[in-house]
Amino acid sequence: MTHEEILTLLGDYVDYLIANSSAEAPMWNIEKVRSGKPNKWNYIDGCMITACLSLYKTTGDEKYLSFSKDFIDFFVQEDGSIKTYDPKEYNLDNVNQGKNLFTLYDIYGDEKYRRAIDTIRSQLLTQPRTKEGNFWHKDIYPWQVWLDGTYMAQPFYMEYETRYNKMQGCIDSYKQFMNIKKHMRDEKTGLYYHGYDESRQMYWADPVTGCSPNFWLRAMGWFMVAMVDVLERMDEQLYNEYRGIMAQLRQTIEDVHKFQDEETGMFWQVMDHPGAEGNYLETSGTALFAYAVLKGVRLGYLPKRMAAWAEKAFYGTCDRYLSKNPDGSLQLDGICLVAGLGGKDHRDGSLAYYFSEPVVCNDAKGVGPLVLAYTEMIARK
């Protein structure tokens, strides 16, 4: 396919997904589809609605906005409560969808969105923390920091503090990024480990460093986008902190780029084991890299030369994994369904573990980031 054909196909693909989805039955939430349970407020749908709202902002097409509003309105009640969401679950994943409430509030001015924003903020006010001050990833994972959690919570936190709290929590957010750099960055590769256990008690944690053993691509992807999204919401008056996160972002992109597959432009599921048996070129993390870099270049956080790396990742992913079925339906393959640490399935962070998780098509953890990268691509035109 030519680049123009890919961009056209992606536009058709998004339209296909939203035409076949609702808040009760999102086609892109494969975990929900497989479970057979009613849908809940969750980060996976949050990724897709963020992508739809971004498409609206870029194209001006109202269908993306009205779909997003209907989706969110299924959950958000007039009093600001959110159906199926419990702040006291203390799960950072559940904060992710909250970013979209700011957008809807700005467009519609409906106070229920403002109240719902406060509902989600209430979770972060009492979210358990490590001794150094980082949010626990979930209440059920005590003393643990996961890279994923930076994307799930920090952009919402930074936006709330900047808009409504006189920037009081902004330096706290910055410090959480610096703690992650201190504890989770590998000096040799520049990559960050998926998880960190401050208590050093988990079976997956290194007894000295507290880190999990491997570099999972999607976790790195979430982390890169988190830095871009936080900078976008941060006031430049916070001179040192703003530049500190920007420097961290630039260094991370430089380090990650070294692991980009020369032929395809993609990245491997476990980043530093290219070609290992069971390893594969993975869609979601590659798309997150493309989006983080394209957006970072557009907003001036990253040098323009990096855009070529992102375009190679974007088109490489589409060439390899985006296809049209004989019945006219479209699909995006090569998406790792899920990966975590600990829990009842004894997820140990080993290579064998990351290679064993299901690889699926059309899940929003891959679709959402690719569509976000697509919005950046069409904005460049």
Regions flagged by a language model, labelled:
Residues 76-83, 134-139, 199-213, 268-278, ...:
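Acidic/His metal-coordination segments adjacent to aromatic residues that form catalytic metal sites
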Residues 59, 108, 160-171, 230-243, ...:
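Inter-helical turn/loop segments and adjacent helix faces that build the functional surface
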Residues 51, 58, 100, 107, ...:
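Core register positions within helices of long alpha-helical scaffolds
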Residues 87, 92-154:
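Extracytoplasmic mature domains of secreted/periplasmic and thylakoid-lumen proteins
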Residues 224-274, 278:
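Oxyanion-binding "anion nests"
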Residues 2-44, 63-65, 74-92, 96-98, ...:
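CBM-like carbohydrate-recognition segments
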Residues 7-26, 66-83, 115-134, 167-203, ...:
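Long, well-ordered core segments of solenoidal/helical folds
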Residues 145-152, 165, 169-172, 207-223, ...:
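Short, contiguous, pocket-lining structural segments
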